[in-house]
């Protein structure tokens, strides 16, 4: 994966995406307000009432960690994994300090430095972070009762392989949430490895259909939805995307 996600600019952008409040993220009365609070909405795709008492959760592609902390509200143990060393170092700093220093860029080199706190009700003591590859997860991480796999597939060289490995790290009855806007780019995934967005034998291949064909061997599809999200670049420029989302339950046999 390119070093794009190791730069200070991207780390700060993701800190704002994960931890800035509503007013800090979108300081306008107009705009896509439904796209705010993505990480909270993502974690809420997990039905906490169906988890075992001592549940383990994996936030695969955790970036700087917000979903991991949201999962800690109802999971006894949460592991966040990301390929970016910079993201994981930043997430660990937040874990240990409880503080999030970030810059709200306004224009050019102008911006406002602020320090936010972790949201109320999360349990940092339940959370840990690990640098790792979604395509080559270590056996030592064990199995999980809940997994969020968000906005990562279209940044992997071999997304099919990553999906196929999920069955090996989930307990029977485990819940899995997979979401992606499917922004396939050559710098991350060559055309031959993509899940969709092309024609094969004259027929359109859609990424969601490929995900279903891969996962249905070991999981049951429970629901699909669209999760919008908004990334602030600066005060007057934002990235708006819609992640196609599917919720799954691991088969018990």
Across the structure, where does each feature detected by a protein language model lie?
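Conserved beta-strand signature within the Rossmann-like core of class I S-adenosyl-L-methionine
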Residues: 174-181
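Conserved SAM/SAH-binding beta-strand->alpha-helix loop
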Residues: 84
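Conserved Class I S-adenosyl-L-methionine
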Residues: 107, 183, 188-224
């Amino acid at each position: 994966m390119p070093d794009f996600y190791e730069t200070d600019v991207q780390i700060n952008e993701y800190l704002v995406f994960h931890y800035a409040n509503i007013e800090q993220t979108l300081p306008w009365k107009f705009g896509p307000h439904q796209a705010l609070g993505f990480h909270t909405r993502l974690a809420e795709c997990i039905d906490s009432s169906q988890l075992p008492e001592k549940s383990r959760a994996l936030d695969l592609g955790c970036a700087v960690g917000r979903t991991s902390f949201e999962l800690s509200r109802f999971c006894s143990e949460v592991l966040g994994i990301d390929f970016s060393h910079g993201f994981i170092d930043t997430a660990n700093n937040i874990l240990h300090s409880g503080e999030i220093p970030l810059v709200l860029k306004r224009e050019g080199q102008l911006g406002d430095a602020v320090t936010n706190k972790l949201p109320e009700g999360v349990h940092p003591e339940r959370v840990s972070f690990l640098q790792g590859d979604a395509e080559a997860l270590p056996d030592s991480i064990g199995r999980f009762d809940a997994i969020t796999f968000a906005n990562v597939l279209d940044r992997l060289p071999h997304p099919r392989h990553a999906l196929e490995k999920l069955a090996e790290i989930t307990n029977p009855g485990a819940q899995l949430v997979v979401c992606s806007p499917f922004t396939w780019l050559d710098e991350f995934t060559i055309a031959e490895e993509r899940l969709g967005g092309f024609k094969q034998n004259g027929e359109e291949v859609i990424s969601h259909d490929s995900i279903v064909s891969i996962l249905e061997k070991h999981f049951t599809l429970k629901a699909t939805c669209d999760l919008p999200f908004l990334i602030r670049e600066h005060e007057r420029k934002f990235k708006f995307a819609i992640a196609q989302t599917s919720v799954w339950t691991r088969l018990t046999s």
